[in-house]
């Protein structure tokens, strides 16, 4: 994610240091675990709302983009942004927590971040986590969304992206699925990186410029 390139393409970049990111200590860094869809989402929205008041910001042409946890964030925000965003891009993000729990290759992360399996009805952290799975808010989606995923991503399988794309299409929302059969959680091959950048900016330019 090249913020300088985004700025060079005439975009103002807002990158909130929300909960879960380094810089404010371990407690801040771990604050997202067990609270997906909670305070960290308020961090995003409070940041964009504050910046939207500035005279150099066009609040009618805002977009949200993210990868990994940021991809999940975009899927979640898609159902909660209340008209703030006019275009979305989600790269390798979790969309359906229940299927994610059973298809990831690394169980430690889903147990730590989501609290455990979705069938544990006695665990309040589990119940909160799965209640905030982005797929449960598709009925509130309105903004055009581009979904990007690599077939060799075993941490967050490409089926998460496919589900999100299909959901958008079935809702009648403009959507695009950029699928890399030879990439994992990252886009590492030069030719794929060029394609990624090209489609990324084409999508944003189409809806925000």
Where does each model-flagged region fall?
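Active-site-proximal cap/loop segments of hydrolase catalytic domains
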Residues: 1-9, 13-209
